């Protein structure tokens, strides 16, 4: 089978802020300053970058693809290449859907203020309630007391757009 190395999916471009984050995470996880990531370091890095613990098989694949000859782990350049590839394949809509679903613990298809408060209490326990209320009001575009997925996605997209343009 002949392949060109390109996929038919639309993969997004990685911006400078994301490149810097990958490098920063590498250095934070390489606590012993070995110049490479061990298997455990790599798992922690994936959690920091993508918010989930990779499976054993995913970790094996990352280790196999990132380890170079005469090195016990994954050095910065192969790590950065793997993480950029992984980031560019991420679907922002799916990510927003996952976050929304985590907030929507009652599976109603919308968020109420209590859902919002509860979610923020878990992820940012020191955040003032007033700030959470302001965020809710900002996200509730039609002021009906509910944040639909569309409202939520607009806020997430706005945040991503600002992250991408400010470097």
UniProtKB/Swiss-Prot annotation:
What are the record keywords, sorted? Answer: Calcium, Metal-binding, Repeat
Chain ranges of the EF-hand domain: 17-52, 91-126, 127-162
Q: Which SMART domains match?
A: EFh
Q: What is this protein called?
A: EF-hand calcium-binding domain-containing protein 11
**MF-aspect GO terms:** calcium ion binding; enzyme regulator activity
> Which residues make up the binding site for Ca(2+)?
140, 142, 144, 146, 151
Q: Name one GO biological process term.
A: microtubule cytoskeleton organization
Pfam families according to UniProt: EF-hand_7 (PF13499)
Question: Does Hydrolase show up as a keyword for this record?
Answer: no
InterPro entries on file: EF-hand-dom_pair, EF_Hand_1_Ca_BS, EF_hand_dom, Myosin_RLC
CDD domains for this protein: EFh
Q: Organism source for this protein? A: Danio rerio (Zebrafish)
Quote the cellular component terms of the Gene Ontology held in the record.
cytoplasm
């Amino acid at each position: 089978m002949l392949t060109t190395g390109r996929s038919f999916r639309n993969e997004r471009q990685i911006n400078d802020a994301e490149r810097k984050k990958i490098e920063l995470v590498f250095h934070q996880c390489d606590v012993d300053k070995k110049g490479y990531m061990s298997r455990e370091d790599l798992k922690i890095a994936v959690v920091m970058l993508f918010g989930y613990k990779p499976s054993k098989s995913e970790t094996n694949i990352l280790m196999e693809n990132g380890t170079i000859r005469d090195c016990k782990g994954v050095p910065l350049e192969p790590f950065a290449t793997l993480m950029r590839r992984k980031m560019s394949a991420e679907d922002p809509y799916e990510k927003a859907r996952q976050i929304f679903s985590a907030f929507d613990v009652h599976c109603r298809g919308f968020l109420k203020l209590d859902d919002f408060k509860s979610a923020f209490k878990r992820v940012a326990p020191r955040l003032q309630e007033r700030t959470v209320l302001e965020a809710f009001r900002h996200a509730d575009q039609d002021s009906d007391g509910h944040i639909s997925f569309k409202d939520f996605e607009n806020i997430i997209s706005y945040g991503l757009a600002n992250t991408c343009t400010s470097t």
